[in-house]
Swiss-Prot record:
Belongs to the WD repeat WDR12/YTM1 family. GO terms for biological process: chromosome organization; maturation of 5.8S rRNA from tricistronic rRNA transcript (SSU-rRNA, 5.8S rRNA, LSU-rRNA); maturation of LSU-rRNA from tricistronic rRNA transcript (SSU-rRNA, 5.8S rRNA, LSU-rRNA); protein-RNA complex remodeling. It comes from Aspergillus oryzae (strain ATCC 42149 / RIB 40). Component of the NOP7 complex, which is required for maturation of the 25S and 5.8S ribosomal RNAs and formation of the 60S ribosome. HAMAP family: WDR12. This is Ribosome biogenesis protein ytm1. The keyword Cell membrane does not apply. Disulfide bonds: none annotated. Pfam families: NLE (PF08154), WD40 (PF00400). Gene3D superfamilies: YVTN repeat-like/Quinoprotein amine dehydrogenase.
């Protein structure tokens, strides 16, 4: 008797149904507005739901979908979700569907002579072009790289070098470059171990195969290596993060900038007669900072502008703290102290969050608003070494890419979460390894700590894709159409 009742109960559970209202914020895949709630078995999982939506849309070629309930991805059956969240099957369940991840495939790798520390992209969709209302023709996108050999290079999409910055003798960097960005289609900024921020004029010949990176302005103020740069082109402003524990606030226009501190300028005694001779035709204006922001007690790894308000800046440091600055008055507004050294920083403005990569192998999402009651809103786990570079998904407010010394880049969707003893934890939705390992036949091999393949910099562009730079002396480009759903 009991066996029969058990089988009846199991059948009832299997046959249990729930009303679901399927919606999408993406117009091209949305169901008609008059589509009402649908009765479905609670045993359905993602694949069956995806089939259902494709049938309702009448798609000849199925589109893989992901499903969100209350802002989090469905990773179980509907029944398990209802049970875990104490929701009655009598309620109508709102389920949002979005396009599933398309793995970002390897497109190309550009080889260098030395480690590549930094990358940036110039395309119609990149900030440098869109803020300048410039149109970059398809196929004419450019990639900027900064290298440990002290040189900047601008590449075309066919892996050809269009332009290289001058050597130290001709007005270039005198040590390794750690950061490089396009300010506009004809302006570049870079910084590194020589403690200077340098602004360059970029121009191309009519054939599009050759160009010039010419020194335009040298900015002095830091007393230690510069680790990262952030640019706000409309206001002609730059932020720099330095190992001297300070943040530099600069103007890209020499007419706005104060005189450079005399004690930091290259001493005349250090200039050899050979260099003087070479430099006789190169006269580069030298200026100082608008302000040096000092409060951190250890090297500053990153400094960025608030995405919505360029008068606000944020900095992350090895001293474990995230600091908010009023850039108009050059004053400290707020300090958030975490448990680990912070090595990288990115703003997710739609969610009022800052993502900070840490020495403890994870990414902490921090709400910088004074009203926030907790420091860490969420933790993203998956890397096995320090997280040293972050970039926002240009097409989704939920997306983030991270570059790590473990030799991988990871794509995150902050809706892909689980809850454990440490609170809300995010899991990466895709991991990108270095193509150089695969070519050596070691794609499955685990490099201890990412030895030889550390990722130093990453950029995510809406046109070109994910561009990463590393210890393998390469820029690597990966692209997957609509990697995350937009929102």
């Amino acid at each position: 008797m009991s066996e029969g009742s058990n089988s009846t109960s199991a059948a009832a559970s299997t046959q249990r149904q729930v009303r679901v209202q399927l919606t999408s914020k993406q117009e091209d895949i949305a169901l008609p507005e008059n589509t009402g709630p649908i009765l479905v078995p609670t045993g359905l999982r993602r694949y069956a739901l995806s089939t259902l939506v494709n049938n309702l849309l009448g798609n000849d070629k199925p589109i893989p979908f992901e499903f969100l309930i209350n802002g989090s991805f469905l990773r179980t059956s509907i029944d398990e979700y209802l049970t875990a969240n104490g929701i009655s099957a009598e309620t109508t369940l709102e389920i949002e569907y979005v396009r599933a991840l398309i793995p970002p495939l390897h497109i190309a790798s550009f080889e260098h002579d030395d480690w590549v520390s930094s990358v940036d992209v110039l395309s119609t969709t990149s900030p440098a072009a869109s803020l300048a209302s410039a149109t970059i023709a398809a196929g004419q996108e450019r990639i900027l790289s900064g290298s440990y050999d002290g040189l900047l290079r601008v590449w075309n999409m066919s892996s050809q070098i269009v332009a290289t910055s001058p050597s130290a003798a001709d007005g270039g960097h005198t040590a390794s470059i750690k950061a490089a960005k396009f300010i506009s289609p004809n302006s570049i900024v870079s910084a590194g171990l020589d403690r200077t921020v340098r602004v360059w004029k970029y121009s191309e010949d009519g054939d599009g195969f050759s160009g010039k990176i010419a020194p335009q302005l040298e900015l002095y103020g830091h007393k230690g290596p510069i680790n990262s740069l952030s640019v706000h082109a409309p206001s002609n402003r730059i932020l720099s993060a330095s190992s001297d524990h300070s943040i530099g606030f600069w103007s890209t226009k020499k007419s706005d900038a104060p005189a450079a501190p005399e004690d930091l300028l290259p001493s005349a005694a250090l200039r050899s007669s050979k260099r003087r001779k070479l430099n006789s035709s190169v006269t580069i204006p030298q200026r100082g900072p608008l302000a040096l922001l000092s409060s951190h007690s250890a090297p500053v790894s990153a400094a960025i502008f608030d995405s919505n308000d360029s008068t606000v800046g944020y900095s992350a440091s090895w001293d474990h703290s995230l600091r908010t600055w009023d850039l108009v008055t050059a004053t400290l507004v707020d300090t958030r102290t975490t448990s680990h050294s912070l090595l990288s920083l990115e703003h997710l403005p739609e969610h009022h969050l800052l993502a900070a990569g840490t020495s403890a192998r994870h990414i902490t999402l921090i709400d910088p608003r004074v009203s926030a009651t907790t420091i860490a809103a969420m933790t993203l786990r998956g890397h096995t070494n320090a997280v040293v570079s972050l970039a926002r998904d240009p097409k989704s407010s939920y997306g983030l890419i991270s570059g790590s010394h473990d030799g991988t880049c990871r794509i995150w969707d902050i809706r892909a979460t689980k809850t454990d003893k440490d609170g809300v934890v995010g899991e990466s939705v895709y991991s990108i390894s270095r193509k150089s390992l695969e070519e050596q036949g070691k794609s499955e091999a685990k490099r201890i700590g990412g030895e030889g393949v550390k990722v130093f910099g990453v950029a995510w562009d809406g046109t070109v894709g994910i561009v990463s730079a590393g210890e393998d002396k390469r820029i690597q480009i990966n692209r997957g159409e609509g990697v995350l759903s937009s929102a």
